[in-house]
C-alpha cells in the first residue's frame, strides 16, 4: 500500500493530526478518526458519523482505509481455537490465532509481524517459508481488528508470537503495541501485551533502553551455548551468553520478570543435564518465568515428548530453581495453530466458516 496516499489505520493520533492539517481539516478531527478506527472499530469511512459528510468524502478521496483480506478460517474441534489466514498482497499470506483459554475469561490473539521469517528455527514451520517482508503497522493491527470482528468478541491479551521475528520489525511492532495499549484506542494494559524474540539481543537492548512497558518473552529452547545453534540459527549471530546478559539487564533495569519459552524436544534439549543448565540460567537471571512447551511439529524428524518425559523434565527443573514454571498447553494443534505450527497446511474442519 503506497504511503503517497496515506493509510489511516496504523497511525498515531499525532500522525492523524498531520494528515488532517494537510487536508485542510481541523486538528481535533484526528481524535475522532483515531477513536473511530481503534475503539469503535469502524470498517469503512462512511461509518465515521461524528464527521460531516463533507469531511468523510475528503478522507475517501485523499486517504486509504484498507483491510487485510480474510482467507481460511479453521476452527479447532478440540478447544475452539481459530486460525485465520490473511492475504496482504499477491502470494503473501500471514496467520493469526484466536485462543479462548477459558482461564478467567482470558482471550488471546496471537499475531504475526512478518510475512515468513528472517530466521530458521528448526522446530518452527514459519522458517520453511520464503521471507517476503515486514508487515506495516496497520497490517499488524488489522489482524486484531479482523479477528475480533470475525469471532464477535474482544481480546484480553495480545501476543506477538505468530509468523516472523518481532525484533526484525521493531519500529512497526512497537508502534502497534503502543496503539494497542492506548486507552483511547484498544485500551489493553501494557502487561496484557507480550512481545517475543528468538534471541535478537540488539532488539532486546533497544527495548530496555526505551523502557518499554510490555511483557517480554525469549524463545530459549536450549541451555547449551554450542548446541543451541543446531536448534536456532539466531544463536550464531546472537550467542546464548550475550542473550543471558541481555536478560539480566532487562530484569535489573526494568525491574520486572522476563519469560523464557522452552520447546521440549526429546534427545535434543531435555533430560536431567539440560534441566539443570536451564535452572542455572534461571537462577542467574533471577526475575524470570519459564514456559515449557511440548514440541508440536513433526516435519523435523524429532518427536513430541511423552507426558512422562515432560513430568520428569519439569520435576528436575523445579528441584533446581524457584522460578515459576508453566507447562504451557498447545491449543489448536488439530488445525496447525499451536506454537511452531503456523504456515503448516491445515485440514479444514467441519466447522470451518
UniProtKB/Swiss-Prot annotation:
One of its GO terms (molecular function) is metal ion binding. It catalyses: adenosine(2503) in 23S rRNA + 2 reduced [2Fe-2S]-[ferredoxin] + 2 S-adenosyl-L-methionine = 2-methyladenosine(2503) in 23S rRNA + 5'-deoxyadenosine + L-methionine + 2 oxidized [2Fe-2S]-[ferredoxin] + S-adenosyl-L-homocysteine; adenosine(37) in tRNA + 2 reduced [2Fe-2S]-[ferredoxin] + 2 S-adenosyl-L-methionine = 2-methyladenosine(37) in tRNA + 5'-deoxyadenosine + L-methionine + 2 oxidized [2Fe-2S]-[ferredoxin] + S-adenosyl-L-homocysteine. Its cofactor is [4Fe-4S] cluster. Disulfide bonds join 110-339. S-adenosyl-L-methionine binds at residues 164-165, 196, 219-221, 296. GO terms for cellular component: cytoplasm. Its EC number is 2.1.1.192. [4Fe-4S] cluster binds at residues 117, 121, 124. Residues 103-333 form the Radical SAM core domain. Binds 1 [4Fe-4S] cluster. The cluster is coordinated with 3 cysteines and an exchangeable S-adenosyl-L-methionine. PANTHER family: 23S RRNA METHYLTRANSFERASE, RADICAL SAM CORE DOMAIN-CONTAINING PROTEIN. Belongs to the radical SAM superfamily. RlmN family. This is Probable dual-specificity RNA methyltransferase RlmN.
